[in-house]
């Protein structure tokens, strides 16, 4: 479904590669964990998968198409990397704005279901600026899920959550995986979180998979 081949990234001004010759395949319905320390290259890899950064060399293909060759290749993706919501807009308005921005207004009817799934329906008219970190994480997750993507990229979704919050998020993702055969790449510092959720996991260190 998604194939990464010999992917490398060297940022301007650096004399080292932040990502070096990374290759990875993720099949349909597979949940793959990505574990590594800060600075290991997790976010760099995910940002290139999300097209917010371009690789120095190598390719990423989705369903046989190079993601950097067309504008709409990631149409079926749900991405949770950097904050994607507006703190001064209500949760409901954030989801509507996201869907309108991406031309997916047909998913408006899915907003209630998604917010109930992440346990934010009762807070739908509140603004994220006053939320706890965990609620902000779930707001970002709702945006990633609302259009029922076929592929999820989640960078450190468990950071800042207490054990109950972590388990709730794991349960949500498991539910989505069982309901629809969606593929996921999820990064974390904690192996235990990934073991509870993923089919397999890979280690990244110094920009390389080990």
What label would you give each PLM region?
Residues 50:
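Helix-to-loop junction immediately C-terminal to a conserved catalytic motif
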Residues 96, 100-123:
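Conserved ABC ATPase "signature" region
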């Amino acid at each position: 479904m998604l194939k990464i081949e010999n992917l490398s990234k060297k940022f301007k001004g650096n004399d080292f590669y932040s990502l070096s010759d990374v290759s990875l395949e993720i099949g349909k319905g597979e949940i793959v964990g990505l574990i590594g320390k800060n600075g290991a290259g997790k976010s760099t890899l995910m940002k290139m998968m999300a097209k917010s950064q371009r690789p120095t060399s190598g390719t990423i293909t989705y369903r046989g198409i190079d993601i950097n060759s067309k504008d709409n290749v990631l149409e079926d993706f749900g991405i949770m990397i950097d904050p994607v919501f507006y703190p001064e807009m209500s949760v409901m308005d954030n989801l509507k704005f996201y869907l309108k921005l991406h031309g997916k207004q047909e998913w408006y009817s899915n907003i209630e279901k998604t917010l109930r799934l992440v346990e934010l329906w009762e807070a739908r008219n509140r603004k994220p600026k006053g939320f706890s970190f965990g609620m902000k994480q779930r707001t970002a997750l709702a945006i990633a899920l609302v259009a029922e993507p076929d592929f999820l990229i989640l960078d450190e979704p468990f950071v800042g959550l207490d054990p109950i919050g972590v388990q709730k998020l794991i349960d949500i993702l498991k539910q989505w995986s069982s309901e629809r055969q969606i593929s996921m790449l999820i990064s974390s510092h904690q192996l235990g979180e990934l073991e509870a959720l993923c089919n397999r996991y890979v280690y990244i260190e110094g920009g390389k998979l080990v």
